[in-house]
Amino acid sequence: GGVALAHEYAAVAFNRRPQFLVNGKRESKMYGDCSEPNFLGYEGPSDHSADMLYTFDEQRQLTGALVCIPCPSQVYELHRFISADYWGEVRTQLRAELGNIFVLPLCGAAGDQNPLDLVRISKDNKRELIVWNAQETEVDRSFDMLRECQQIGGRICDAVLRGYRQARNEIQTRPVFRTNCFEMDVPLRTVEKADVDAASARIEAVKAACPAGGRLTEAQMIRCFEDIGYLNRWKLQQETTRFTFPIFVFRIGAAAFATNPFELYVDYSYRMKARCKARQAFIIQLSSNAKGGYLPTQIAVDGGSYGSKPVSTMVGPEGGDELVEKTIAAMDALF
């Protein structure tokens, strides 16, 4: 058999961290309402790349497609059912065009991304965005989720088909294949004692307001999530100041693949893709059993909100910089 590579574009990801002017400062808000008068713009970029690796049998017939899109499949976010989300539509539409091929989805760096355009949906979802931002319960937003998945699936399918028309003429039967797996460690994001003490006081206040023998509601538990995170981080940083996790890198032909265990913000991926020796780089997030959480940029930490605070991040921007340098070095060593 053989393989072939292709790079295309599909508009799937949108930044999910709009920024607002609050008391003269820029503040970020995960899933904020962009129709508010103090909306300033987005905290960071989006990546509309679509990276593909196609597999072929000995008769040069297509057998599968690995598709890397830097966006989580979360159209159905905050609903209590299992779904393949837009990837189900990608598989259906691709198989209608290319036959019963195997489709392997990969999520590129997308910690600050989501598949919905907040500028477009904010006007009709003002109440829903408040619930969505709180992440405390299910929320039915004012748009057709199935239709969104079908449209996203169509855009990805178009990119895969465009790439296939090029790739089928560039099949490699003996590509260079090299691989490496190693343990990487980067600085653990630490917290200050004053913040831990304040978090502990807030938790005790919630406990005091709860009837004896009673249970916290789901919303109350979620509101304690951030403060519990401060306590847990303080305990962890007494034991270590490094976060360790497995990294897998491999080369197939002119492409490099690198994993990480984070919801990695797009800017880090851009740096790795631009600076590595590989002509094409697949930066694959959330791809080990290590629980890395989000890995925000300094701009995100300064902006605040979920996805940039200690409770949802094991590593901060300093660790992100180190991840970039070490990952580039590991990929380049394969060339």
List each model region and its residues:
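Non-catalytic substrate/cofactor recognition surfaces at enzyme active-site rims
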Residues: G1-F335
